[in-house]
């Protein structure tokens, strides 16, 4: 019995391993998550940033052409940073059919084109060692469209405008939003 591993056997087992790994990722729904730009697909969820902070989209309501968002932010940073409305943006991405019947992705709304996001209960907030958390920061985006089937609301928070390659993102589909609102109405909130 020989304990040598031939080139042919190596290639055979390498190919089998590659197929197994590829198959496992397809079956397991493997999805890459950029650590600098984490994404949540739920309302009332929190994300951690490499910039030593945690932010959460606590609540979201769309009614009468206004999208109202409630956010919580916690920091463990030594140096303080300011929260401005321009740190946040909201957009709606939908699916549309062209003249040939092919579906394409379209941007139906972008808050920066509508005057940006506005804070309801603050103008700007300093977050740092002396004030490490902001809870219940409310903001609105106006001229907001009613959600249609296939729409996704993209809510983005960029903590430092000079470091726009770091962001926290929420991708809320119409179905997830409708489910969130239904749960709120049944729980009496």
Residues covered by each model-derived region:
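Low-complexity, acidic Ser/Thr/Pro/Gly-rich terminal tails and inter-domain linkers that flank the onset
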Residues: 38-62
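N-terminal secretory signal peptides and thylakoid transit peptides that target proteins
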Residues: 1-18
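Bacterial N-terminal signal peptides
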Residues: 20-22
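Surface-exposed edge beta-strand/loop patches
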Residues: 38-40, 127-189
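Structural beta-strand segments of beta-rich domains
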Residues: 67-69
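The feature marks short-to-medium sequence segments in extracytoplasmic or secretory-pathway proteins
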Residues: 61-64, 74-135, 167, 180
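Bacterial signal peptide processing site
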Residues: 31-32
């Amino acid at each position: 019995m020989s304990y040598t591993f031939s080139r042919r056997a190596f290639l055979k087992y390498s190919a089998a391993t590659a197929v197994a790994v590829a198959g496992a990722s397809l079956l397991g729904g493997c999805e890459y998550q950029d650590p600098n730009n984490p994404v949540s697909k739920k309302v009332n969820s929190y994300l951690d940033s490499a910039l030593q902070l945690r932010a959460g989209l606590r609540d979201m309501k769309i009614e009468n052409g206004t999208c109202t968002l409630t956010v919580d932010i916690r920091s463990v940073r030594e140096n303080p940073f300011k929260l401005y409305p321009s740190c946040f943006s909201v957009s709606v991405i939908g699916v549309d059919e062209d003249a040939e019947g092919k579906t394409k992705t379209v941007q139906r709304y972008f808050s920066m084109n509508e005057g940006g996001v506005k804070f309801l209960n603050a103008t700007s907030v300093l977050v740092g060692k002396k004030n490490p958390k902001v809870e219940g920061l409310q903001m609105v985006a106006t001229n907001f469209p009613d959600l249609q089937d296939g729409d996704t609301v993209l809510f983005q928070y960029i903590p430092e405008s000079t470091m726009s390659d770091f962001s926290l993102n929420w991708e809320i589909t119409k179905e997830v939003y409708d489910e969130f609102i239904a749960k709120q109405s049944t729980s009496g909130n």
